[in-house]
């Protein structure tokens, strides 16, 4: 009997050792934002682990440094906004691939808020986008997703970026602090920051940017080396697709034209609160939209590059076939059944 137990124990330890050896670490660059919820859900629910992937989350303060870190080989996967910096890294000869959806600015789904000083709102000084003319508006960096989004919103309203004083403040927390300290009149920041400004009484959400201009703001992108390891890259995407579906069914469900809590809503709220450090009631203000299976709005990526070229932030647009690869997400969708 003892001999049998010893054999069984050795077999169990060997199996555990094999499983540990098969679990492949992947460094993933992310921001502590509500839009990163699918990544957080995938980690907490073990969806990546189910396919032998152990994500190591590396947190950043803004989107552009994630692209730089990916190019430098400090991370293998980036999950954040599409910036001019990312496109320019590719133009400079580095290879990376945009592979999946990680968030869209979409009507009815809060992501980036245009937030104004509460005092200016109460005085009636800023009540619309057109009232931003001549005002100081803070954002992370020039060439950021916020820069692109603000420019396109202004153009729809008959304004130009030159009609405002755009102030780059490098990181999201410092952008919020600038509004609090009245160094700027308005800011553009993603959830949970808009909700926090209102909860603390110094900010007022003027509008949700996705209600004014819809686009593919954020994606998952792979570094050259990671993409070359096809099996590992597809396995990561399998976990991501599973997490994306879970996220979608929990927090993006609509009924009669309104977003309503779906299955596992409270669980996803708690997971997101844990990783962002925001209170659950702030998280509940809303989650950004993304495709249930993680599929990209590919034509929108081309539109973005055209805009950056027109505004002097890129020398030329990159052919989509040289920067977008949807084969990873399509392979994962086929492999991960409902």
State where each predicted segment sits.
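Bacterial N-terminal signal peptides that target proteins for export
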Residues: 1-6
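Bacterial N-terminal signal peptides
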Residues: 7-16
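Short, glycine-/small- and polar/acidic-enriched structural segments
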Residues: 22-161, 165-169, 185-191, 206-214
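Short, hydrophobic alpha-helical packing/hinge segments within bilobed ligand-binding/sensory domains
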Residues: 66-67, 85, 174-178, 194, ...
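Periplasmic-binding protein-like
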Residues: 103-113, 198-226, 237, 244, ...
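Loop-centered beta-sheet repeat module
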Residues: 167, 171-203
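Secondary-structure end/capping motifs
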Residues: 228-315
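Conserved C-terminal helix/tail region of periplasmic/extracytoplasmic solute-binding proteins
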Residues: 301-338
């Amino acid at each position: 009997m003892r001999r049998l137990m010893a054999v069984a124990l050795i077999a169990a330890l060997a199996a555990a050792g094999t499983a540990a050896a098969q679990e492949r670490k992947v460094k993933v660059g992310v921001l502590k934002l509500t839009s990163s919820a699918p990544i957080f859900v995938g980690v907490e629910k073990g969806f990546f682990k189910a396919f032998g992937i152990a994500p190591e989350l590396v947190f950043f303060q803004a989107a552009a440094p994630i692209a730089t870190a990916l190019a430098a080989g400090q991370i293998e996967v980036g999950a954040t906004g599409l910036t001019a910096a990312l496109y320019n890294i590719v133009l400079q000869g580095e290879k990376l691939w945009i592979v999946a959806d990680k968030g869209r600015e979409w009507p009815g789904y809060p992501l980036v808020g245009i937030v104004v000083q509460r005092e200016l709102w109460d005085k009636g000084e800023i009540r619309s986008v057109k009232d931003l003319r001549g005002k100081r508006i803070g954002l992370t960096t020039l060439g950021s997703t916020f820069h692109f989004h603000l420019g396109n919103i202004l153009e729809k309203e008959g304004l130009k970026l030159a009609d405002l004083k755009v102030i780059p403040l490098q990181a999201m927390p410092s952008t919020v602090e600038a509004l609090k300290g009245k160094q700027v009149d308005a800011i553009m920041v993603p959830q949970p920051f808009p909700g926090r400004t209102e909860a603390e009484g110094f900010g007022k959400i003027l509008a949700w940017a996705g209600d004014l201009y819809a686009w593919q703001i954020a994606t998952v992108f792979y570094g050259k080396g990671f993409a070359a390891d096809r099996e590992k890259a597809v396995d990561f995407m399998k976990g991501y697709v599973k997490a994306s579906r879970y996220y979608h069914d929990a927090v993006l469900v609509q009924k009669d034209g309104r977003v309503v809590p779906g299955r596992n809503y409270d669980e996803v709220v708690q997971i997101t609160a844990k990783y962002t450090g925001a209170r659950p009631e702030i998280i509940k203000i809303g989650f950004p939209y993304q495709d249930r299976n993680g599929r990209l709005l590919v034509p929108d990526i081309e539109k973005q590059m055209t805009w950056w070229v027109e505004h002097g932030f890129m020398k030329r647009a990159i052919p989509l076939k040289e920067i977008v690869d949807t084969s990873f997400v399509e392979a994962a969708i086929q492999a991960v059944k409902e």
